[in-house]
Amino acid sequence: INKSIEYFDNAIELETDLEQKSDYCYTAAQVLFANKQLSKARQYARKAIEYNETKGDPYILIAQMYANSPNWSEESALNKCTYFAAIDKLQKAKSVDPSVAEKANELISSYSRHTPKDEDLFFIGIKKGNTVTIGGWIGETTTVR
């Protein structure tokens, strides 16, 4: 895997077309995600976004990474807040690239079924509108809804 990422890095460095650079970064992110190197995969997905801000697929990939990593706390309700962060990325994907709306909406529907119940959040002192920072490698803040 490291060798293939090295080839991607070389291609990204040599490429002058920003859209192609974005595509290389996105493909590298997919390879890393498939090999469970999530933090590094997210770095490449973010690079893909830097090179082409109008593509929604990198945001969808990041959302899928988050949804595959919901266990960062001993508190189940907090873990389920990870799905809010994933949904945030899917909303962003739709806003920058309407062509991915159908795929994003399907995932939003799926991930919404895994978000915490109001009563579970209540028991740990969290309510709708509060912000939660997702732990572990994700490290992003999201709003409870």
Label every PLM stretch briefly.
Residues 1, 18-21, 54-58, 100-101:
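Residue-level recognition of tetratricopeptide repeat
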Residues 1-3, 37, 82:
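Residues in the short coil linking paired helices within alpha-helical repeat scaffolds
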Residues 10-18, 47-52:
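Solenoid-like repeat scaffolds
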Residues 16-19, 30-36, 63, 68-78, ...:
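Short coil/turn linking the two alpha-helices of tandem helical-hairpin repeats
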Residues 92-145:
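Terminal, low-structured helical/coil segments at or just beyond the last alpha-helical repeat
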